[in-house]
From Swiss-Prot:
Keyword DNA damage: no
Miscellaneous: This protein has four functional calcium-binding sites.
GO (cellular component) term, any one: myosin II complex
Protein name as catalogued: Calmodulin
InterPro entries tied to this protein: CALM/Myosin/TropC-like, EF-hand-dom_pair, EF_Hand_1_Ca_BS, EF_hand_dom
Organism for this UniProt entry: Blastocladiella emersonii
Superkingdom of source: Eukaryota
Purpose of the protein: Calmodulin mediates the control of a large number of enzymes, ion channels and other proteins by Ca(2+). Among the enzymes to be stimulated by the calmodulin-Ca(2+) complex are a number of protein kinases and phosphatases.
Residues the entry annotates as binding Ca(2+) 4: D130, D132, D134, Q136, E141
Length: 149
């Protein structure tokens, strides 16, 4: 996982890590973790921090070493990449940029992708994703649909 990071990213993470490694022993406490991540432009919730810490701090000693920290940051960055990809995909479908994907927009994109859909098939796709029942797909519904695939 950490091998997908660039040298610049690793250097940046090392610098931030060192700032919070007060005694220079190569570990930071779980409490300091949130501060480190915020300094790198991430904004984890308390719940996300707990999950990350539990995943990383295998021995439960309350500290995280640099290799563990790198693995965790690589995971976090991978997650935000896929979020960006979903936003871009939504823009492709939302031709008029009104924040909704209509049946016509869905049919148009699917046709361009080589999928000739009947009226019923398009309606069915909209129905499956359309949580609030307004006949079109908003961004939240689109994200749910993409994540469930």
């Amino acid at each position: 996982m950490a091998d997908q990071l660039t040298e610049e990213q690793i250097a940046e993470f090392k610098e931030a890590f060192s700032l919070f490694d007060k005694d220079g022993d190569g570990t930071i406490t779980t409490k300091e973790l949130g501060t480190v991540m915020r300094s790198l432009g991430q904004n984890p919730t308390e719940a996300e921090l707990l999950v990350m810490i539990n995943e990383v701090d295998a021995d439960g000693n309350g500290t995280i070493d640099f290799p563990e920290f790198l693995t965790m940051m690589a995971r976090k960055m991978k997650d935000s990449d896929s979020e960006e990809e979903i936003k871009e995909a939504f823009k492709v479908f939302d031709k008029d940029g009104n924040g909704y994907i209509s049946a016509a927009e869905l049919r148009h994109v699917m046709t361009n992708l080589g999928e000739k859909l009947s009226e019923d098939e398009v309606e069915e796709m909209i129905r499956e994703a359309d949580v609030d029942g307004d006949g079109q797909i908003n961004y939240e519904e689109f994200v749910k649909m993409m994540m469930s695939k």
